[in-house]
């Protein structure tokens, strides 16, 4: 998939919503626990209910790895289900990988060749040679952690050098000099929306994956105001506020309602920018 194809889907669906599949077996509706694979059953219902309103799904690997091989199987089957039933959806594996070159080669092979996801979140801490194996896959995107929404982002990401440049700004700026930098996206938390204007000066054209809207309290309006570019350039993720909106047998309908409400807000933002 190209960024143009992604933008076309955003315009067609009037949405830049990414639904995060942070599925915790302890939080899903009790009636699903009788299923052979409760996690997969929950995910299928959420996917079916929200696919109309979003352009991407982002399963978070940690929630599946916590259940060992059973969870890994649920993760893989979830991706297969999206691919088969909703092939126009952009799939982001939220795994936050990143290691020396040989290890990154294996991570890239696992997610891009075996699982066939469209994008993978990656930590940039080890530098260019830890990222280049991911960028070698044409049509696949590497989503670098840049400025995250957690309180601990202040510990390192917001450190300034002698010239006043934040560490996260340096990460973004230098990564843009790497080969195949057009395949980079960046994680920027919605709770850091005040920094989006400065980030756009460094990467005016890149897509930003923005978690933190919804349960974490980030403002969709602020994100759209300061982060949207001429090709939208945003994938705003919501997880808990959608998938755990209800814990009864009507959970999927409630999730659909939450996703639809966000889609309506996104349509307003896209129209305000003249993109649709």
Swiss-Prot record:
Pathway: Pyrimidine metabolism; UMP biosynthesis via de novo pathway; UMP from orotate: step 2/2. Gene3D superfamilies: Aldolase class I. One of its GO terms (biological process) is 'de novo' UMP biosynthetic process. It is an enzyme of class 4 (lyase). It comes from the Bacteria. Coiled coil: none annotated. The keyword Lyase applies. The active site is at residue 96. It catalyses: orotidine 5'-phosphate + H(+) = UMP + CO2. Keywords: Decarboxylase, Lyase, Pyrimidine biosynthesis. Its EC number is 4.1.1.23. GO terms for molecular function: orotidine-5'-phosphate decarboxylase activity. SUPFAM superfamilies: Ribulose-phoshate binding barrel (SSF51366). Belongs to the OMP decarboxylase family. Type 2 subfamily. This is Orotidine 5'-phosphate decarboxylase. It comes from Porphyromonas gingivalis (strain ATCC 33277 / DSM 20709 / CIP 103683 / JCM 12257 / NCTC 11834 / 2561). The gene is pyrF.
């Amino acid at each position: 998939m190209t960024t143009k194809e992604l933008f076309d889907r955003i315009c067609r669906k009037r949405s830049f919503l990414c639904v995060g599949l942070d599925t915790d077996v302890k939080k899903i509706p009790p009636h699903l626990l009788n299923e052979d694979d409760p996690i997969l059953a929950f995910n299928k219902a959420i996917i079916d209910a929200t696919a109309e309103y979003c352009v991407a799904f982002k399963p978070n690997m940690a929630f599946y790895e916590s259940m060992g091989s059973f969870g890994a199987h649920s993760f893989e089957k979830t991706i297969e289900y999206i691919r088969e039933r909703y092939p126009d959806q952009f799939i982001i594996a939220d795994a936050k990988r990143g290691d020396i070159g040989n290890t990154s080669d294996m991570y890239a092979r696992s997610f891009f060749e075996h699982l066939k996801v469209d994008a993978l979140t990656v930590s940039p801490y080890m530098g260019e040679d830890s990222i280049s194996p991911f960028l070698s896959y044409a049509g696949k995107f590497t989503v670098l952690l840049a400025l995250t929404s957690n309180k601990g982002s202040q510990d390192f990401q917001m450190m300034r050098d002698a010239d006043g440049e934040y560490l996260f700004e340096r990460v973004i700026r230098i990564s843009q000099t790497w080969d195949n930098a057009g395949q980079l996206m960046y994680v920027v938390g919605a709770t850091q929306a005040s920094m989006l204007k400065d980030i756009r000066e460094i990467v005016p054209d890149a897509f930003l994956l923005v978690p933190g809207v919804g349960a974490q309290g980030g403002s969709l309006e602020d994100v759209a105001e300061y982060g949207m570019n001429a090709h939208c350039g945003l994938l705003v993720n919501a997880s808990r506020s959608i998938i755990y909106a209800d814990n009864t047998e009507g959970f999927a309908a409630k999730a659909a309602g939450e996703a639809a409400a966000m889609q309506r807000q996104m349509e307003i933002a896209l129209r305000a920018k003249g993109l649709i």
